[in-house]
């Protein structure tokens, strides 16, 4: 088995992880980091907008979009942490298709919000002479967008299909059950 290394702890390929390991990875690699980084990005965006509001390239409206993304993500992650992930850890497949459809819809909404972040940040193109705060804002927002895209991909392409396929599989109605 190929092992990806991300620094100190080697991480096995996600497709090779069991459900509990994959959920733990999502919680630590994505949920915890989104919660840690988003409030700082919102504050930094507010600062850059306030200080540079008269600069034509200023990312006006970025703080508002990041704040909305933070609220959307928090609601989404809570649904996963308190409803979906516990059911998945217990191997529940009955009735799981509807919550998965809702969460996939959330992912589509997040993708649109990522697009708005990139639009407000003008593709993360810094103006000449941009201050350190502006540089940190764009670096952090770019990382957030990349992380969130990967987070969505891991759930949509690796975790969710395991349950969608199992829940949609025809059941044997024979004597052996």
Label the model's feature ranges.
Residues 1-177:
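Small-residue-biased structural context
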């Amino acid at each position: 088995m190929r092992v990806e290394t991300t620094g100190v702890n080697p991480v096995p390929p996600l497709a090779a992880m069991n459900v509990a390991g994959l959920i733990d990875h999502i919680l630590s690699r994505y949920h915890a980091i989104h919660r840690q980084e988003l409030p700082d990005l919102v504050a930094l965006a507010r600062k850059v907008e306030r200080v540079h509001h008269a600069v034509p390239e200023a990312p006006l409206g970025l703080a508002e979009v990041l704040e909305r993304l933070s609220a959307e993500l928090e609601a989404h992650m809570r649904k996963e942490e308190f409803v979906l992930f516990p059911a998945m850890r217990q191997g529940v497949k009955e009735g799981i298709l509807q919550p998965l459809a809702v969460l996939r819809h959330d992912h589509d909404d997040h993708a649109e919000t990522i697009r708005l972040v990139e639009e407000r940040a003008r593709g993360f193109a810094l103006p000449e002479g941009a201050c350190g705060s502006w540089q940190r804002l764009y670096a952090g927002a770019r990382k957030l967008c990349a992380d969130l895209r990967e987070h969505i991909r891991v759930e949509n392409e690796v975790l969710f299909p395991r349950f969608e396929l199992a829940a949609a599989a025809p059941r044997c109605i024979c004597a052996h059950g």
